Amino acid sequence: MQFGPFENKDVFAAEKFSQKKHLVSKSVELVLFRGKKAIFLEAKSSIPQSSDDINKIFLPSIAEKLSDTLHLVASDYMKILSERDSLLDPLKGRNWEQLSINYYVVLKGMPKDQLPALHNMFNAYPLLNKLKKIWSPNKSGWVKVINDVKARDMGLIASGND
């Protein structure tokens, strides 16, 4: 799946930046600035079939990506990162105190009826719950688990995008 199309000024390509600079081990694919939202986006083409694998491998990996990306963004905001890289430009001048942090996990081909259970699993996961308390305390269900159909409807991926 490919996200977009978006204007470059609205997208922090977190994964590309972290791979280039080796600053964090994992990161979400991108942070999209849309209105008063900072949308942290991650996409997966599949998920493990067993709930044990989901809980022991999948959820920890996704949670680590969000955590590392939040640290990366915060360190840039606090001017700890002294990087001069155009990939950081979309972070500059953002009024973070006015932005709502949202986390979307897009699961390709996931049937709509399976999304609520996954949504609940993500939002109950301890690390994600802890991050929510710090970064988005007034928001319930801050991790949104959606499929590619919903992502397309929301304008997060292009029509016909596979």
Model-assigned labels for residue ranges:
Residues 23-35, 90-99:
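Short, surface-exposed loop and linker segments with low hydrophobicity and enrichment for Pro/Ser/Thr
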Residues 37-39, 102:
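Structural motif
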Residues 112-162:
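Polybasic (Lys/Arg-rich)
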Residues 1-27, 33:
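Acidic-basic catalytic patches of nuclease active cores, encompassing PD-(D/E)XK
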Residues 45-110, 127-136:
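Catalytic cores of nucleic-acid endonucleases
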Residues 30-32, 39-45:
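Conserved catalytic cores of phosphodiester-cleaving nucleases, focusing on short active-site segments
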Residues 9-10, 19-20, 80-85, 115:
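A short linear-motif detector with a strong N-terminal bias
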